[in-house]
């Protein structure tokens, strides 16, 4: 392997590279962790939760400052001028990185796809919403070879438009423009993605080598990808295009395709549309010996200025480019939208061959079609070629049925690809209210739509009256608080899904989630619905209250009463404006992935879960976007309020349950209590009097972590102090309101 570096500095010694792989990049160097590296606290004590995960993207790292308002800056952008500049860029081939066929469209489509395509449904992480492709590890994934060049091609445009367009939006929008520049009619586009300024630690796999697969598949007969992963292979976006583990089996590859694209919320038709549509353009690159490619951007020498994979094969660019190690041109019109991909896929029989770099691919059998595929730089015509995963679109019975239909009805492919591409680019952005710009398409089911407000909202007098009504309804404060939490706590800050807006807690599937205690919901919701109906029937001026608003308002009223019972007078801020979604506009299957495996705030864990409870509590806190102090305040407050799942008393360290007090912290930190593992109940601890041995409390790890974890204990000590009872109550209220308003993007 040659790193092809200048003599001024050696390659980065912190990353070693491997030159053997059975993956998409058969010999392109991949990073390996440095042995003997200094250990972090997490390395010494891997079972301790890392609460720093709750504080990603600190404002100190943002060069634009905390007051920067991207939506406000974007409003100044001439989007048509930006689009025109991007369209012009497509055919402005640069000598330092020449365009295939004189058009950068294929490269930019891949850039946008690989930016958005990291999204995964099980935890909502990934996607193009933050411009993460600029940072490690994604900028150095083996699957992203040469995308560093694509981003550098965009720099003059980013420099020109400045803060008015984020990198996150630009990376995704450019692919959309690329499609349109080659004759495709897209479905629309929404701006609104805000940049991050440093990478976030995301678990993309437990393998200690890129291109590994050994830690994400179980040993069962059926190959099944572990949750929450969205890719078959460490460092790839979806699947190995040579087939599973580099074995060129199109049918086996179809299984992997279906699973990984499903992890991105795509069904079979959407998956086929993306592959067929995306592979209508451009080519792959495997011109020669991949061992001649240098290290990835994060390991490249400093003088390469963030560009990686410098190749010493020929010129290292243009006709000598090595990106994936595969050398495939799918169609005879690689810069034009048409149906040629399917015409060629079904127009030939195919035989297994290898690229010049040694990667498995297919070529039209017996020399058929020789010379019909144009060379990207004017060389002799080529034979038709396809990836192993392209052949999957023909031989898999389900994909084959879909693609054969499109072969005869190309207009159906155009519509399917347009909608699937739009979904791909926007899946992690949350509700349509977050979209900016003039080209936003009509709401789609996968965006979890809620109706617009079409009536006057309740005022302060109405709010006070409704609070009084719910407190006199016969429902307990605990029932009201639990229902409000159940409604709001489905929110995921990763992909901005879930939350109280829409009142989907009353709909399938949420109303039957075990964590939400369906039987109790069935008691509480009808009472609140009657209050809503009575108010709406009698309110003056056409004012109405949605059930979504009333659920949150009822929880607020209950907290105010609980605080008063604890000796504190507080007002829980409330902002009306939520509306009620319909079952018709709620995709049950799509929402199923939001069901919590555990919710430590309610001391709930799904039967059979073996992951440490405190780790799942931290994950839930991360989804809710709360800080370590907010996490601490919320758990302590909810325990004092006695709102555990199923009414258990674990962590209810108080002799006045239901009152909002700091008793949880006072009693947790009481050295008169000794904690022991329960001998009879899994995941339960017993707190006994040190002198008498008498049982005082029971708890789970969700409770005791606030005494055992040094960072969380430091916060708990603040709230346990004799002078901080009121501070705790106020902090709890602020954290509660944050959770209730997480999905109120209209307030932000």
From Swiss-Prot:
UniProt crosslink position (Tryptophyl-tyrosyl-methioninium (Trp-Tyr) (with M-264)): 113-238
Compositional bias annotation for Polar residues: 1-24
Annotated stretches, region: Disordered: 1-43
Complexes and interactors: Homotetramer.
HAMAP family (alphabetical): Catal_peroxid
NCBIfam families the UniProt entry points to: cat_per_HPI, PRK15061.1
Protein name per UniProt: Catalase-peroxidase 2
Native species: Mycolicibacterium smegmatis (strain ATCC 700084 / mc(2)155)
Species lineage: Bacteria, Bacillati, Actinomycetota, Actinomycetes, Mycobacteriales
């Amino acid at each position: 392997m040659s790193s092809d570096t200048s003599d001024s500095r050696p390659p980065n010694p912190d990353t070693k590279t491997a030159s053997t792989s059975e993956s998409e990049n058969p010999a392109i160097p991949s990073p390996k962790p440095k042995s003997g590296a200094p250990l972090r606290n997490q390395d010494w004590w891997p079972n301790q939760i890392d609460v720093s995960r709750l504080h990603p993207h600190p404002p100190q790292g943002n060069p634009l400052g905390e007051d920067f308002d991207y939506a406000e800056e974007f409003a100044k952008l001439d989007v048509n001028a930006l689009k025109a500049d991007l369209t012009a860029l497509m055919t402005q081939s640069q000598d330092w990185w020449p365009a295939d066929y004189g058009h950068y469209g294929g490269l930019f489509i891949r850039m946008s796809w690989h930016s958005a395509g990291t999204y995964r449904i099980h935890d909502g992480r990934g996607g193009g919403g933050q411009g993460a492709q600029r940072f490690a590890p994604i900028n150095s994934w083996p699957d992203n070879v040469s995308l560093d060049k694509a981003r550098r091609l965009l720099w003059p445009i980013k420099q020109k438009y400045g803060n008015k367009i984020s990198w996150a939006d630009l990376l995704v929008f450019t692919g959309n423009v690329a499609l349109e520049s080659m004759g495709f009619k897209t479905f629309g586009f929404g701006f609104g993605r805000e940049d991050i300024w440093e990478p976030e630690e995301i678990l993309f796999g437990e393998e200690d080598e890129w291109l590994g697969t050994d830690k994400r598949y179980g040993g069962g007969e059926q190959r099944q990808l572990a949750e929450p992963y969205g890719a078959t292979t460490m460092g790839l976006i979806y699947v190995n295009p040579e087939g599973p583990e580099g074995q060129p089996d199109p049918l086996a590859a179809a299984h992997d395709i279906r699973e990984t694209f499903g992890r991105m919320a795509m069904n079979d038709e959407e998956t086929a549309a993306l592959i067929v549509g995306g592979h209508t353009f451009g080519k792959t690159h495997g011109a020669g010996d991949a061992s001649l490619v240098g290290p990835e951007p994060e390991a490249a020498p400093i003088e390469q200025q963030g560009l990686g994979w410098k190749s010493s094969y020929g010129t290292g660019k243009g006709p000598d480019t090595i990106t994936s190690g595969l050398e495939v041109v799918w169609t005879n019109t690689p810069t034009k939208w048409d149906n040629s991909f399917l015409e060629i896929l079904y127009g030939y029989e195919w035989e297994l061959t290898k690229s010049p770099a040694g990667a498995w691919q297919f070529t039209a059998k017996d020399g058929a079609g020789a010379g019909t595929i144009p060379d990207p730089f004017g060389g002799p015509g080529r034979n038709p070629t396809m990836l192993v995963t392209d052949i999957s679109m023909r031989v898999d019975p389900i994909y084959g049925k879909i693609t054969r239909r499109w072969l005869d009805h190309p207009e159906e492919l155009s519509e399917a690809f347009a909608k699937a591409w739009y979904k791909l680019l926007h899946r992690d952005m949350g509700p349509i209210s977050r979209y900016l710009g003039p080209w936003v398409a009509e709401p789609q089911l996968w965006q979890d739509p809620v109706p617009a407000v079409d009536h006057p909202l309740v005022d302060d007098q109405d709010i006070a009256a409704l609070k009084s009504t719910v407190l006199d309804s016969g429902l307990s404060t605990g029932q009201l608080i639990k229902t409000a939490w159940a409604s709001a706590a489905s929110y995921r800050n990763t992909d901005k899904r879930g939350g109280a807006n829409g009142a989907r807690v009353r709909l399938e599937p949420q109303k039957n989630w075990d964590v939400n205690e369906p039987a109790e919901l069935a008691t509480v919701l009808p009472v609140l619905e009657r209050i809503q109906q009575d108010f709406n029937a009698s309110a003056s001026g056409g004012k109405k209250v949605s059930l979504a608003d009333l659920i949150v308002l009822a929880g607020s009223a209950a907290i105010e009463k609980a605080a008063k019972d604890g000796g504190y007078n507080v007002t829980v801020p409330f902002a009306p404006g939520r509306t009620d979604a319909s079952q018709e506009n709620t995709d049950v299957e799509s929402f199923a992935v939001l069901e919590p495996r555990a919710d430590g705030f309610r001391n709930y864990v799904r039967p059979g879960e073996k992951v440490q409870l405190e780790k799942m509590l931290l994950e839930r806190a991360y989804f809710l976007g709360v800080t370590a102090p907010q996490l601490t305040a919320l758990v302590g407050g909810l325990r004092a309020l006695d709102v555990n799942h199923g009414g258990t008393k674990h962590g209810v360290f108080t002799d006045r349950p239901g009152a909002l007090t700091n008793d949880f912290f006072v009693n947790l930190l009481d050295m008169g209590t000794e904690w022991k593992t329960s001998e009879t109940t899994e995941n339960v601890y017993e707190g006994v009097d040190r002198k008498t041995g008498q049982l005082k409390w029971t708890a789970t790890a969700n409770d005791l972590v606030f005494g055992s974890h040094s960072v969380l204990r430091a916060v708990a000590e603040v709230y346990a102090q004799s002078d901080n009872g009121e501070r705790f109550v106020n902090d709890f209220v602020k954290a509660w309101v944050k959770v209730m308003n997480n999905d109120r993007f209209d307030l932000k």
